[in-house]
């Protein structure tokens, strides 16, 4: 089990500035923001700081949700893809059921190197045990992920929509 699958002292790990610089876009809303945003650099106009899954999301969103325990990301990703306009950040746990479900719904996914997230006190954290996936939903997200790939942030992949294999038999 990875560190992010266990319950720790805090689920607050902030995205470093260079990720947003590579994306080159601004967001209408950060749907998983902390109350104290002193060390948060998300370029967003509005911030949801509590009960986000119960709130109405609008516009082009940024989502770096609490990773929590096993399958804690599933409800966040379900709401993200239902919303259909934004970029989400998660671990790149390709064998996890939530990851495979999200893969089927994504327009694009950017696989990054390990990101040293920012602690609530503003200091960089240690290198995580795995890489990160940035999920794109909608045209603006696709453009931002394409730009980030060109900037060298990661490798861009697009899920293949499965068709009935019997059509080829």
Identify the meaning behind each predicted range:
Residues 1-169:
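Class I S-adenosyl-L-methionine-dependent methyltransferase catalytic core
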